[in-house]
């Protein structure tokens, strides 16, 4: 992304560009070119992998019930990063279209350079805030990530806000100055980007994102963490929030929140009431990322909330000040809108109550004693070829088969490495019946979402969902460096019914694997050197 000379000049004077342009808006039927290009997002130029040529990628939007037809074209060539690609539409259930879910070697083979693949899926019963990203190797850390919003013309919260459009979408990202495959974890980002703009350490001139508001109006802000690693504490000076959505699921309005802790891949919608004196206010994003030497290694992310009529200058408040929260968002205080209780477990179903024990043994993560290694044949293709049991499905020990139309509970103790990990389940949202920072179980009205932090030492998280969507669904840590080190399993839901449920599978899907397998080794997915995964500090 190039900035004009006048933008840089104004930034040097502490002048904000109130005409800040949002990324392009496309969809629901569109082409999406995946390219290599140089970007300068924080004062440091580097080559990146970009969707639509921008970071973040263009906002893909549609309405509840729409058919999305997104034709992804792979124009990648820079072999310091992956040149094959896949796209995951994070939070979309993909009912009957598991083949379009995106994770490499779970539901498809990667798209080879010079080739295209049409992702064709509908969202009949979903609306909310989602995102999309590469789901192979560490590619999304190199730039392939963007927002995805499904609007609901009959939104039950519609009377709470006046504005909800592309100008109210905020993405939070970590950014690195070298290719992800070369980074040695724990990965200290060089900067935090808000809507694709930020400043590296000691930089005071790179342009910042500006969110424009008008006094007296109410805005639905859609906050998306497209983070590859750290979680963030998000605040806006002088303003509180009313939370109305978590991960594409409506919540009872929760007012008075002054800080949102948001983990990689999570999303929140909140109402911002522009009721403060006309001025400019800092939007602050503090990364919870501690370097290997035990000191904070990444500068805070900054953007500007600009009221119409305020002078075009930086906010007067100290930009380096760390806000003190009085009423931070706590997950257990969120409740699903219209909740009617959580289904009971079937005591006769042994495979319906699963405990996943997470451990780390340099350089790999293990789930119940097994580290995830991608198979050479996608799990979906294995099922379509007649493998239906956990014993038959690869990778060995990492596939759990689940019966259909059952309530499943997954129990996840926290504390591995002493840090919180965001766990994401594909194909479903789930009820968080016990949150990481709570010792209470809520079976009446827990929040529903698709990505949950399992917390630190002593935490215990439990989730429940119903197996009403046959297919192999990835469950993994959304810290991408941890996924690359084996922090994942596959939940194979009702494998025997998958061939009849997941259809029609397009002929182009069948061609992905032969084309990928014919690629030379240097064009297949880059694997981080084992040494790059061996330096996580035990805390």
Curated annotation (Swiss-Prot):
Binding residue positions for Cu cation 2: 90, 133, 478
Gene: LCC1
Chief subcellular location: secreted
One annotated GO molecular function: copper ion binding
Classification via PROSITE patterns: MULTICOPPER_OXIDASE1 (PS00079)
Protein name from the UniProt record: Laccase-1
Binding site for Cu cation 4: 421, 477, 482
Record-annotated disulphide pairs: 109-513, 141-228
Domain Plastocyanin-like: 37-154, 166-309, 374-495
